[in-house]
Amino acid sequence: MTESFAGFVEDVRLIDHHVHGAYGADSNEERFQNSLNEGNCGLLAEPSAAYESQLGFALRRWCAEIIDLPRHVTAELYWRRRSELGELEISRRMTRAAGVSHWLIDTGFKTAGMLDPRGMAEIAGATVHEIVRLETLAETLIQSDQDPGGYVDAFTGLLASHAPIVVGAKSVLAYRAGFNHDLSRPPADRDVAESAKLWRQRIESGGAVRLDDPTLIGFGLHCAISLGLPLQLHVGFGDRELDLDRANPLLLLDFLRSVEASKVPVLLLHCYPFEREAGYLAQAFDNVYLDVGLAVNHLGVRSRSLIARSFELAPFTKILYSSDAIGPAELHYLGARLWRNAITAVFGRWIDDDEWSEADARRVVELVARDNARRVYGLP
């Protein structure tokens, strides 16, 4: 591998096709520590344990220099310096160091102190596009004065009003109901209306607003398809509210075989530990794409193996870059940093072994870093 190839990977601008806002407001160390754990959706019993992880080690190795500290600084000194700079300055430094030209932001999950898309564009000095989360849109609608009996037309109209200002739609079906449902056809209007009525009754009786009805979620998916929106589906690893065995993308086979699903790009997000299954689906279906974003940060140095596996079966025109970062902007930076490290190491080895030419490697880097996302989402 030549130094010029390593420099090429370092300089390539990325399109992060699935990400969330960074924090813009200061808070305490416990918020920061809890943000470094994906699996536990509650508050950590020992927040400092978050530092004793692949992500914690990667953060102290790669992010320390961005805030003027030596590599591998202690967690105590890292937090002290971070507090001196403040959250907004951290977000500015980290997002700009990531080398991302376009952030495609899922605005459907928000926490206190998080930057909105306009704030992200300003702080990162980059272009921002919005991804609409279908379940959040439905939850907004069901809490309105809209008669649930008219849910079909109301949701269709609401999503259609968003279509001109977003570049895609995202579903968290994996979290809410799992993939083990028949999604191959749009549900009947009467079934949708009945499910909406039951949902409203549950809320009025003091139940949760959280949408977990597979009929309504499936209806949302097919609405997005009918509008021609690229469809993002969270796959695999997430917090403990998700049943991992029901988040295997192979359970989507009947859906992907359907005529309806073939009409739009279907993007399998993150996929760990099902990246090989996702790679098979990307090879098997013309309209299926994947990334391995979320797990990259959490695997730290071991993400090199994950990223290498993503290049086994999937055509290189079907792999995209994402970080799925949310909250601390270190995650927005680390996603890019660890991806560049892995690509340089993995592709570099293939070049050195004369399995790949450097010209081919450069071309694939550009495909995954940005060109595939440009094509799928119709970005300028």
Language-model features and meaning:
Residues 1-17, 29, 33-69, 73-81, ...:
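Mid-to-C-terminal alpha-helical segments outside catalytic/metal-binding sites
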Residues 13-26, 230-236:
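Histidine-centered catalytic micro-motifs
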Residues 18, 103, 169, 234, ...:
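Divalent metal-coordination and catalytic microenvironments
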Residues 20, 108, 133-139, 172-176, ...:
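Active-site beta-loop-alpha junctions enriched in small/polar residues
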Residues 30-124, 130, 152-164:
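Alpha-helical scaffold segments that flank or form the walls of functional sites
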Residues 93-97, 115-130, 157-166, 223-226, ...:
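Acidic (Asp/Glu)-rich catalytic clusters
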Residues 164-276:
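Divalent metal-binding pocket/active-site signature
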Residues 254-256, 262-380:
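H/E-rich (His + Asp/Glu) clusters that bind or coordinate divalent metals
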